[in-house]
Amino acid sequence: MSTIAIVDYGMGNFHSVARALQHAAPDADIRICNRPEQIDAADRVVFPGQGAMPDCMRTLNESGLRAAVERAAASKPLMGVCVGEQMLFERSEEGDTPCLGIFPGEVRRFAGPQFADPVAADQAAAAPPAAARERLKVPHMGWNQVRQTRSHALWEGIPDGTHFYFVHSYYAAPSDPALTTGVTDYGVAFTCAVAAANIFAVQFHPEKSAEHGLRLYRNFVDWQP
C-alpha cells in the first residue's frame, strides 16, 4: 500500500485534499503530516497551500518541515497544489518573498486591469478597445480551461481543454519553458501546471474539480517517475 503524506505546515486545505485523495485512491494510506520524519517515511508527498505567500513561507520555515519538503522534492513523487505549486519557484512578487527555489522562475501578480480574450503582441493594433472587452476580476476564481502543452502521465484519461477550479491572484512564471505542461487564459496566458522529473504541480485545485480533479490525484498515486 502506498503511503501519501499531505504536508501540514498550517497554511492549507489539508483535510479537503485528504478527502479527495481517499476518494480517488481508497487503496492508499493517506496521512496529514506535521513532522519531518512522517514526510521522510512516506512514498509520495502532496504539498498544498493557500493564503499569502509571506505567511506560507514563514510558517513552513517555522514548522521545521522545509527541509523535509526539499528532501521529498529531490527523491520521491511530489505534487504541489495552488500556493504549494508557487512555493516551488525562486521568489514571489507577493511581499518580495524568497521561496524554495526548486524550479527557476518567479511568481507574479495578475496585472490589472485584466480583460477577456488575451491578445498577442503582434495583434494589439487590431484588437478592440479595452472598454469593449469583458473586464476580469482578480482574484481569478472559478472554473477555467486548461490546455495541455505536453503529454504527461498525470494527464492520462483527462481530455485536453478540461476545466478545473481556480482561486488565486498570483501565478508561476517559469524561467524554463520546458517546465510548463498546462496553460490557462485569464487576461494573460499563464502557466497553470509544471512538471520535471519526480515533481508535478498545479495552480488549480484538483480537490474542487470534480471527476477530473480526482482522476489527477489517482494518476499521481499510480505515477512511477
UniProtKB/Swiss-Prot annotation:
Residues 3-225 form the Glutamine amidotransferase type-1 domain. GO terms for cellular component: cytoplasm. One of its GO terms (biological process) is L-histidine biosynthetic process. Its EC number is 4.3.2.10, 3.5.1.2. It catalyses: 5-[(5-phospho-1-deoxy-D-ribulos-1-ylimino)methylamino]-1-(5-phospho-beta-D-ribosyl)imidazole-4-carboxamide + L-glutamine = D-erythro-1-(imidazol-4-yl)glycerol 3-phosphate + 5-amino-1-(5-phospho-beta-D-ribosyl)imidazole-4-carboxamide + L-glutamate + H(+); L-glutamine + H2O = L-glutamate + NH4(+). It comes from the Bacteria. It holds the Pfam family GATase. CDD domains: GATase1_IGP_Synthase. Keywords: Amino-acid biosynthesis, Cytoplasm, Glutamine amidotransferase, Histidine biosynthesis, Hydrolase, Lyase. The active site is at residues 82, 205, 207. It is found in: Cytoplasm. InterPro entries: Class_I_gatase-like, GATASE, Imidazole-glycPsynth_HisH. The keyword Hydrolase applies. Its main location: cytoplasm. One of its GO terms (molecular function) is lyase activity. Pathway: Amino-acid biosynthesis; L-histidine biosynthesis; L-histidine from 5-phospho-alpha-D-ribose 1-diphosphate: step 5/9. Heterodimer of HisH and HisF. IGPS catalyzes the conversion of PRFAR and glutamine to IGP, AICAR and glutamate. The HisH subunit catalyzes the hydrolysis of glutamine to glutamate and ammonia as part of the synthesis of IGP and AICAR. The resulting ammonia molecule is channeled to the active site of HisF. This is Imidazole glycerol phosphate synthase subunit HisH.
